[in-house]
Amino acid sequence: MTNVFTIDAFREEVKKKYAPVLIGLSDDVTVELKPLLKLGQKAREAVVEVFKEFADIPDLEEDDDDELVDEYSLQVCDIIAKAFRLIATKPKKLIAALDEEPDPRIRAELYAAVLNTWKRETQLGGSRALAELIDKFGGAILADLLQYYRVDLRDLFRDEDPLSPRFVLSLVLCLPKDGAFYAERRGGQQYRGWTEDRYALADIYDAIQAGNHILLLANRDPKKPKPKAPKSYPRPDDLEKTTPKPGSFAAMVVRAKKAARERREREEESAE
């Protein structure tokens, strides 16, 4: 498993508190660049999509003319400006201040410098990976962190002295395999507790049952019916969806949905 914490990383965590990036535009104007984790899910996804646009900008060659280099530089500025509109508290003022630089190349470097500062100070790599995990398995991660580490995931979003994304991600990556997080990743809470040891015990149980069955068959009274074959120990992988019993609430819901679908299909055919 990847080691996301080194001695230098620990030193950085101790010396510096995790906080939003503040960009001073003047004595009385400050722009805050919000950490990725403090954005809404749609905004986070939009930021990720913006970064993908950099792949469309071709690599510069030594013999490229100045006009082409300037054009690429302006494209870089436009892409980063899209990100600023999503993460900055005052994006128009920030973009206007950066656009005061007339030289496209220097302007692009200014845009990139601000963006790289935000990426470094907010631990973008850890934030992005952790945000994706929380979006998918937030409840399970919350439960496991409290159970195994006594860490409250909500402290990640505190305004004062919040937990760092890299710290929380390290804990998540080392969660036990029999916990709620790994169960959700495998398909649901029915997998909780099903580690390699549990599967091995289930296999041993089945083998013992099979051996006992063979012994019964070999020593049974021919006049009596054969003993039934033993059932395998139930495993979460073997669980199948059962059809709702007639008359149950689930069956009525299924029947109502089917009737609504058939009625909608008839209406569509009549409209045609």
UniProtKB/Swiss-Prot annotation:
Chain spans, region Disordered: 219-272
Keywords: Viral release from host cell, Viral tail assembly
Biased composition (Basic and acidic residues): 234-243, 262-272
Coiled coil residues, start to end: none
GO biological process, one term: viral translational frameshifting
InterPro entries linked: Gp24/Gp25 (IPR020132)
Subunit structure of this chain's protein: Interacts with tail assembly protein Gp24 and tape measure protein.
Family: Belongs to the L5likevirus tail assembly protein family.
Function according to Swiss-Prot or TrEMBL: Promotes tail assembly by creating a scaffold for the tail tube proteins. The tail assembly proteins Gp24 and Gp25 would wrap the linear tape measure protein to create a tail assembly scaffold. It would allow polymerization of tail tube protein during which Gp24 and Gp25 are released and therefore are absent from the mature virion. The tail assembly protein Gp25 is produced by a rare -1 ribosomal frameshift. The ratio Gp24/Gp25 is important for proper tail assembly.
UniProt name for this protein: Tail assembly protein Gp25
Biological source species: Mycobacterium phage L5 (Mycobacteriophage L5)
